[in-house]
Structure formats: structure tokens, C-alpha cells
Amino acid sequence: MKVAVVGATGLVGTRMLEVLAERNFPVTELLPVASAKSVGRKITFQGKEWTVVSAEDAIAARPDLALFSAGGSTSAELAPKFAEVGCRVVDNSSHWRMDPTKKLVVPEVNGDVIEADDYIIANPNCSTIQMLLPLWPLHKAYTIKRVVVSTYQSVTGTGYKAMDQMTAERAGGKWGEYDAVYPHPIDQNILPHIDSFLETGYTKEEMKMVNETHKIFGDDSIGVSPTTVRVPVQGGHSESINLEFEKEFTLEDVRKMMEETPGVTLQDDPANNVYPMPLYAWGKNDVFVGRIRRDPSVKSGLNFWCVADNLRKGAATNAVQIAEKLIEKGFLPKE
């Protein structure tokens, strides 16, 4: 299969290449696409060197699949051009997510919604993906009335420049002496501010979690109240999740569901200091769930903690899994 990776030299793009290789995705020809300054560079994939090409050259090569992680404006401009030549596009930006004509997919949750005429498919927000994967079996069993979620999001979600800012601060750099992508220092700090603020007081990141939950679950009645926070870690995103159900549940059944849910790993033995942590989620594809306990303030309430590598399941892995679903449905060649 001829595969283009748009944004191949970025944080998520490099993870996409890693995941394609690790999962033995049937790539016979790779078209790494990046900005003009990177065209001509060599990258290594599956032991072979490939040359970074322009988007125009990649489109002319008529790939079967294009994985996009190059920002919303790039996706808005280029995704339709790839689709016009018969290429299936999986886009990691926010541009297409709430477009009513485009599918927003977490394969383990709603992969079956993909149809033959879906040439541009949206990858959800990283924090939404890791929340909804464990929520889906719980919603099917007990019907979620309300979700209250607070996120603790890695600087890797912002990209290389955010990592550089944190590194400079940890080396003793003073504010104003280094390039900063955040409005305040991030090292030894926490910023309750991801993306821009809206008139409601919520941020765009928070509203992504609300709107994407409704679209993926196909249920606008679920109450979602998020607070998204940037923290000075690199391993992945963490979330404190509080749920209120329509139906009663047992903790034993909840734990069993988490053990049996594909893509979820249960780490819930706090007496022995076993619980999910971003340091140990780094580089892994699963969503890790623990600290499962009742919320005593409501009749059918549940609290838990979940962690995932935002560059993996929160982005690259989910995108490749969507492509695998396209193969499974016969919409992409098997080789």
C-alpha cells in the first residue's frame, strides 16, 4: 500500500511512522510529507531511507492512504486534494471533527460507522480518546448521565517547542531569555489553560471534550463538565473522571469490564502502590485505568483515574487503527 504521512517530521508524525512499523501495517511505498524546509531530508522507516517530499508531489503519486498531523489549516487545504485522487485521509487535527459530513472515530467505540464514501475521517482530541475508551462499556451497561473530568496534560501535546521551553526552564533559564509557547513558565507550574478561552469561560480544549463525546457516543444528553490543565510532564495525559449513572453498578463488575475492554489495561491495586502514571504509560498504546472507587455523594457515582500516552493512543495509534479498520472493511488494499 502507498502511504503518505503528512507532518512526518513532527512529534505525532514520527509516532505515526513508529506505530505503522510496530503494527506491521502493509506499507509498500512511503511518502513522508513535511514543510518546504524539510523537503529532501531523509528519514528511516522499516530499515530503509525515504525522502521527504512536498504535498504536491505526494498527491501526484496518488497514495492509497494519508495520515495527517500537520495542523488544522494544512488539513483544511490539503485533505480534500488527497481525497480527490482517491486517497483515504485520517486527519489528526481538529478541523474536520465537528463537520456533520465527516466521521469522528475511536475504532473500539464506533469504528463500524465508517462507510465506503468516507474519504476524510477525523481523529478525535487526545483527551477525548483516552476518556471515551473506558467510558464506552460503562455507558452501554449503566447509561452515563454526567461526566466531570479534570485533565493533567503533558507538554508533548503542544509539540517540540513546548518541550524545549520546559527544558530551558529546568536548565535555569529566566523568563524572557528563551522562546516560550506558553504565557507563563511551565516547569514547577501548572496552567489551567489549554487552547484559547471562550466567552463562556471554558477553553476550546474543554469544549472539544464536550462536543466530541456527544458526537462519538451519538448522545447529546450526556452532561460533560471538563477542566483541562497543562502540567510539566512528558509521558502522557492523566485524567480524574467522575461519573453519575442512570443505573446501579458494582465495583467488581466495573473492574471486570476494564479488564475485558480492548485497549484498556487495569492498574488498580493502591494498597501496593499500583495505579496509572504517565511515566510508565510513555511509549505504550493502551489506556491505563485505576483508583476505581464509588462517589459517596450521589447514588450511582463512580470515580477513576486514567492515563495514556497522548502521542500514541491519543493520536498516532488511534489514526493507524482507523486505517486498519478501513482495511478490515475492504476500503483499503491489504498490501
Could you tell me what each predicted segment is?
Residues 1-186, 221-223, 287-288, 292-297, ...:
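N-terminal Rossmann-like NAD(P) cofactor-binding subdomain of oxidoreductases
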Residues 66, 155-335:
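Charged docking surfaces used in two-component/phosphorelay signaling
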